[in-house]
């Protein structure tokens, strides 16, 4: 999945500026023309319709809701139609209205998401549905003296972005009657205060890091040279000091949005020809307010609930006949995975959008974040971290001209208490590999402590002494999984349990754990060790032939075992199969529930009710490959792993066997390089993809005969009537 013409948001100031393409400018002009038309129509109906109301600004206490610019409290009656409400929201540039009853009392609240999911997504007719049928009753309100943090926590807890604000009366009654609604506050207004606080904290941490860099280098040099004595900082205090500096560096850099991406939740995708009704139905079913629109494998735009209100219902379009490409927002702004959360929030507040697609370095879509994700991230900062930042502001005033010993004592004296708030145990550095390759007691030795060696099981001794593959595999799950990430530096957690964990389980207590470090030597061959080792892992249990065949194709005889095993295998839930149906709908299937092609076909038939479907995928050479046997599926997964893809994309093609047998010869295939998959040649690939074309031609040829017969019959009838008329006239 690649990105089309999108503007990518990075962490630099120049890239943060919004780059609006010509297409989006034209879309903005059309929206403004539509609003003017709606205002004109509403003015003719009501006679005194006003232009969009500006935000309400009040001189309240700083840090409270009363000091923010509130949205106007638009009200509609319970008996109003959804289309009328959508036109009012579009004309007033609002995404939320309050619903009142006959007594002018607050009865509910309706947002753009409610209209999109509860009305259009539920299959209701917006021209006949009352606003009372889709509103949220008994809305939660806050008073004007509520602080921003409390309002934001309330929004995150209940998962909504708008809160009605009522007056607290004030000491002299100047703020209005107590209980009167004075406006509506949205989540963006509540996020400005936390963003300013995070900016101040990161600035203070950065200043302290700059002040401590010199002391850190001198401590590290003394630790390496062994000159640390009792007159200076002790070894334990030096380690705490270095840990404190590293934690400050992380806090100064900020949290990346990649840490918020859940690999099990992917953005919902629709095609350009998907109707608005189908897209909103998918939004309601998945509980999201936006979907990405794909065109030929690239992101063409984003379709949100705001688009449903403004460009569909307010414009008078039919959701069942309008496609999303007509009303979507083209070329949405995207963010790199390395972007800081605070920077992403600032960009969303500046651009006034609530959904942000996330891309990697290769411009591939890896997820989509909403305001809820980012707001939750900044509000989950523990109080301990805030204490660290407060301490950093005080410590940043230390003069660098002090002596090294005095500076260390002063810094450590101020930071020892805050260091206790952290439960961080970084991996200890590794010593270089020993020169003797025959050493078998400890291939990797840690400088701080000697960790216990795991027990050697019987099957491991047998595998190390023989090149024959074992006949029995031990494990608990039935799945194929192997990481294709580049080799990384080995850490303590790669081979041994941490100090806080229990020692390695033994065969007596029923565990089959395996530690690689004492048994993998630089001279070992990965092709000899990999099948037996990986077959013993829990995630490969129950299907030895599947794992063995895949690893024989993946691991070459010249590969080194020390290069293969440091790879961190992904969990079974991280690799998925995405099926795109004939109609363009996308389904996400879990790999641990699919063990063969028949299981995949069964899953497809359950979701799409398509009996005659040919399953295909695109290989690394761009060929259309048909999935016929289990070996084809195994090879497809293996190719996706080699290419570093987290998923396998499978497409369904209609199999019209009657037309194919009568009008086309059998499809010619060539053998694949691995296994026995059938690769459709490019010459006939188009006939499979556009399989409706020969059917249409055949139907068109057959339809010519009835047309010809009808024309001849009509001519004969007209001629007979003319002759009868002429005879009678004579």
Swiss-Prot record:
Compartmental location: Cytoplasm; Nucleus membrane
Major location category of this protein: cytoplasm
Keywords: Cytoplasm, Meiosis, Membrane, Nucleus, Repeat, Transmembrane, Transmembrane helix
Domain PB1 span(s) in chain numbering: 572-649
Residue spans of biased composition, Polar residues class: 458-470, 480-515
CDD domains in the record: CBS_pair_MUG70_1, CBS_pair_MUG70_2, PB1_MUG70
Record field: compositional bias (Low complexity): 7-20
Renumbered residue ranges of the record's region Disordered: 1-27, 420-517
Stored InterPro entries: CBS_dom, CBS_dom_sf, CBS_domain-containing, PB1-like, PB1_dom
Topology in membrane: Multi-pass membrane protein
GO biological process assignments: meiotic cell cycle
Domain CBS: 69-127, 135-200, 263-319, 328-385
Positions of transmembrane segments: 290-310, 358-378, 706-726
Gene Ontology cellular component terms for the protein in this record: cytoplasm; cytosol; nuclear membrane; nucleus
One Pfam short name: PB1
Function: Has a role in meiosis.
PANTHER family, A to Z: CBS DOMAIN-CONTAINING PROTEIN CBSX2, CHLOROPLASTIC, CBS DOMAIN-CONTAINING PROTEIN DDB_G0289609
Name this protein carries in UniProt: Meiotically up-regulated gene 70 protein
Organism whose genome encodes this protein: Schizosaccharomyces pombe (strain 972 / ATCC 24843) (Fission yeast)
Gene name linked to the record: mug70
